[in-house]
Amino acid sequence: MSKPNNQNQQNNQEPAPEDANELIAQLQAKLDDIVASGKQPYPNTFKRTDYAQDLQAAFEGISKQEIADNDAKGEKTQVNVAGRVMLNRGAFIVIQDMTGRIQLYVARKELDEKTLADIKSLDLGDIVGVSGYIGRSGKGDLYVHIEEIELLTKALRPMPNKFHGLADVEARYRNRHLDLMTNETTRDTFMVRSQVISGIRKFMLNERFMEVETPMMHPIPGGAVARPFVTHHNALDMPLYLRIAPELYLKRLVVGGFEKVFEINRSFRNEGVSTRHNPEFTMIEFYQAYADYHDLMDLTERLFNELATDILGTTEITYQEEAISLKAPFIRLSMSDAIAKYAENFDMNRINDREYLAEYASTTLKQQVKDVFGVGKLQTIIFEETAEHQLRQPTFITEYPAETSPLARRSDDNPEITDRFELFVGGRELANGFSELNDPEDQAERFLGQVAEKDAGDDEAMHFDAEYIEALSYGLPPTAGEGIGIDRLVMLLTDSASIRDVILFPHMRRKLEG
């Protein structure tokens, strides 16, 4: 490959700060020249009719000779394309639009000197509109034979290294516009994310669920065990909380008669940031009357199967070099059975012995144990520390303790456990669902238990929500509900190691100046 000149920024290395400043000055000078010539530097009159990917697909299998024969018969395929200049080699230019890349062919003998000069002055990152007709090179590459070309936007900063994009991961997150511009993998990831969300919506609508919107700011945080973000409403002079989950509002809609509802939106939790957690995240929550948690496990299997098949073409995927099958049925395992399988040197005969559980959690697992923790809380800690990370294939863990499931219905067979499940894939939780607690007296007692934990210092415990108890008293039909983390699902389907790779603008620590 020939090495372009400096003025077109095509250097194999990232420019040093002084070089970058020089390039910025050169780009600004070019813009000044355009303005001085009387041209509109940012015109908005070009109308695109064609996309790169569509043209590549339309001419797949059509040879160079066939295209030339059509040209000779006066049957040229006229197109109007637009995009960002990614390569300018004089005879050929490569532009990129939202669907992909396509070449532009510069026929020097057919273009006037002014047009050739304009083409020569193009820099990487400039945005152009091109009218011309389709051709194919001797190497088989499809191109647009330029008849007219117009500069639509002049780039005033040099692009990142065109061969390696943004090498620094943090720089990619902070400058997602540059990452998308130069990194095909990043663009593909967010195209899949869009397909996942639209696919979920299509699936739910086909299942006769109704899409709804509920408040993002709550007077009382609820619907999950988590620490909320707090704000203040000046006009009402009251604290408000960014929602940690939409659950309680959605169940009030079921009380009102909307028997199958779902919402896709953000929730917020004022907790740690990691490869699995972002303070602002996207989830779907849905509720179905006259269903139980078994029905939702079946629905979840169908949903995951359909998404993988429609988007990836298969249910057999690879995540971080590990083969995972999303084909139904998924593994189903109770929490106690998971502890028996994965907790080393654990005496299952003492699974309900609080003293033994506390000793195992604190001594063997090195976990902090508080006096307020009951048997169910300790069982959950032991499960999370010993089993969770080992659940590689899709696995529904069922029969969670009532103590750690304040909104879930108690099991008819054992009131100490609930009709609840969580779905784990690749050692990570992707979904949480249960048959809903619709007994208002039991719900009030569980809220009081959460209040006791909060008073004992648990910042993540729930508040007592009297309005929800009142709504529940009007009668919630037998109902099952579930939440699925869309960010983690996209991580799985795109083989992304970090949640930051699948969120366009993840939260970052403020960049220090200087």
From Swiss-Prot:
GO MF terms, alphabetically ordered: ATP binding; lysine-tRNA ligase activity; magnesium ion binding; tRNA binding
Biased segments, Low complexity type: 1-13
Catalyses which reaction(s): tRNA(Lys) + L-lysine + ATP = L-lysyl-tRNA(Lys) + AMP + diphosphate
Cellular localisation: Cytoplasm
Pfam family of the protein (one): tRNA_anti-codon
Residues engaged in binding Mg(2+) 1: E422, E429
Residues that hold Mg(2+) 2 according to the record: E429
Chief location bin: cytoplasm
Keyword field: Aminoacyl-tRNA synthetase, ATP-binding, Cytoplasm, Ligase, Magnesium, Metal-binding, Nucleotide-binding, Protein biosynthesis
Gene Ontology BP terms: lysyl-tRNA aminoacylation
GO-annotated cellular components: cytosol
Cofactor: Mg(2+)
Cofactor note: Binds 3 Mg(2+) ions per subunit.
Disordered: region residues: 1-21
EC number annotated for this UniProt entry: 6.1.1.6
Protein family according to the UniProt entry: Belongs to the class-II aminoacyl-tRNA synthetase family.
NCBIfam families: lysS_bact, PRK00484.1
Protein name: Lysine--tRNA ligase
Protein source organism: Psychrobacter cryohalolentis (strain ATCC BAA-1226 / DSM 17306 / VKM B-2378 / K5)
